[in-house]
Amino acid sequence: MIAVIGEKPSVARDIARILGASEKQDGYLSGNGYLVTWAFGHLVGLAMPEAYGIQSFRRESLPIIPDSFQLTPRQVKAEKGYKADPGALKQLKVIKEVFDQSDKIIVATDAGREGELIFRYIYQYIGCNKPFVRLWISSLTDKSIREGLQNLKAGSLYDNLFLSAQARSEADYLIGINGTQALSVAAGQGIFSLGRVQSPTLAMICTRFLENKNFVPQKYWQLKLQTTKDNVTFTALSTEKYDMQQPAIDTLQRIKEAETVQVKTVERKEVNQEPPLLYDLTTLQKEANTKLNFSADKTLSIAQKLYEGKLISYPRTGSRYISQDVFEEIPERLVNLEQYTRFGGYAAGMKGKALNSRSVNDGKVTDHHALIVTENLPDKMEADEQAIYELIAGRMLEAFSEKCVKDVTSVTLECAGSLFTVKGSVIKSAGWRAVFGEKEDGEDNAALPAMQDGDSLPLSGIELLEKQTKPKPLHTESCLLSSMETAGKELENADLKASMKDTGIGTPATRAAIIETLFSRQYIVREKKNLVPTEKGLAVYNIIRDKKIADVEMTGMWENTLAKIESGEMNPDTFRKGIEVYARQITAELLDVQLSFVSGSGCICPKCKTGRILFYPKVAKCSNVDCSVTIFRNKSDKQLTDKQITELVTTGKTGLIKGFKSKNGKVFDASLAFDEQFNVTFVFPEKKGKPKK
């Protein structure tokens, strides 16, 4: 018997169908000599501190650094702490039984770092030692699965991939557990999540927000001249930008006395615009955020659905290139797109033409090639799925199309001793840009009239423009993904820049989840398309901004090391020792922090309706300094929780709270409510009357 394990039931069923394993069993399919089972994502993970006999959120327990990591079935929240997920336990039992009945295993989890980790953790946890081989494919079409099954890879080829995934998993555990617990212990109330990648990402958002908020615009002035040639009127801007208004006014007056404008230089050149590279996941997420206002997480979710629907290749890719053998299949894919309504005409026009090979490079294909559509055409799709599919299909058409050719004319004019410039652009051959027909910034200029050096033109107008400098815009998800992807540009060390360019902060597969974590922790919110830190997020940032845990350069070093483990250049034990030292350092830094923590409840003040309720260690009060709403946390010897205060603020009354203590020591139960002046008062439960006889 041969066992096969997929990452999800849907994928396992497709593989089982192709293998002829059609008999349904409890948790697996059988037939034709195969037993095909599945995981539900991460069934096994690293054990929580309590599994090692360590009490969490105790100063004396930190740092938490196990001698060796224990694996445990996936955990779910219970009334007290966590417990094993019953569904995970059941499926792990099935997997063990399937493996025990088999002579070897075909690993068909996702062909990537996390897919490898999912299988290896299960394999270790159930104590299996059967030999295994790897199904490594980039799409889930029947053709791709069949070819993959005929070309199974030795499992040992992916040992370094697993070691890198394991090292990343353990590093995230050590930094996340210790950072979160140390800051929470120092704060004295609440849970404040930190992470190896999460914290530098929060720092990037907060840094940009504060730069934008504290930016002081500077005024400057520029002159705009108007002239005419061959009945075509156009304008040009002065090359000089004036910091002071008076010199600009003086120049304006001088030019007003002139009658003509001299053509100083005319530069004409043909510009060839190469087509864009194919999408990797991050580039797709950026484009979908800009054009469709989709979050990174939403885009990944839709792409995963299209992948499982056999319509696109593996989405969690970090490459924008395809290999030569995949390139040979592209003409067939383009013929298929002739039947797709939106792109049919354009795809038909590419038939017989030489395809652009800019996106073809065997040396730049990583675990998976760039995103492309498969040979399967979609039947019915939801609107959001269609939008993402069309981005990928359209980009594929662009990538293999001809260059866009433009005529660009740059003219320098002189008037009364001042220089002005204007640029015109005309598309001669649209090439790849005909796919979507979109204009680029600065292409609204009509073609400039023909001019030569020395031409004299009439001055038909001059005006003074008052402008001001602008701050860097707030981060959108699109520009944050760019910052995460190319954070190395902010570094001074050349070697680190190179490593960060390749690996960045996080990975293509994890960046969306990191951003979503910041939302779920209430560290950031969306304001239109912008990502804005909350009071809680800013408070955390103010604590960690000069600490190692928020250091982009340090994160880059770890990413570089993880990449070296994957390539076999670095021993994972060396990495582990370094991470342990790092965990001890950040724990010590955070435990030494002296702070009075303020976090935002997100609740509008019920009295003034303009401020927001802020949580402090001893009180909660309105952010509006002119408002008097204050709620003391300690009420009659009972410490109020954030949840109880939030309920009071939002509804005007809490549920029944047990355990208040009067001045004479008597324990009583009551609700809390606001009176007409928004003071907090007790509301006692109605006493049940004695039944009538």
Where are the language model's segments positioned?
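Short strand-coil-strand connectors
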Residues: S30-N32, Q226-D230, E414-S418, N664
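C-terminal or mid-to-C-terminal helical accessory/interaction module adjacent to the motor/catalytic core
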Residues: G87, K93, D100-Q101, L140-T227, ...
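Metal- or metallocofactor-binding catalytic centers and their adjacent structured scaffolds
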Residues: D243-Y279, Q285
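Basic, low-complexity terminal or inter-domain segments flanking catalytic cores
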Residues: I2, G81, Y125, T180, ...
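Amphipathic alpha-helical transducer elements in NTP-driven molecular machines
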Residues: P9-A16, G33-V36, F40, R59-L62, ...
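Intrinsically disordered, low-complexity regulatory segments
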Residues: M1-S169, G179, P471
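Conserved short loop/turn motifs at secondary-structure junctions
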Residues: M1-A3, D110-A111, G188-S193, R268-L277, ...
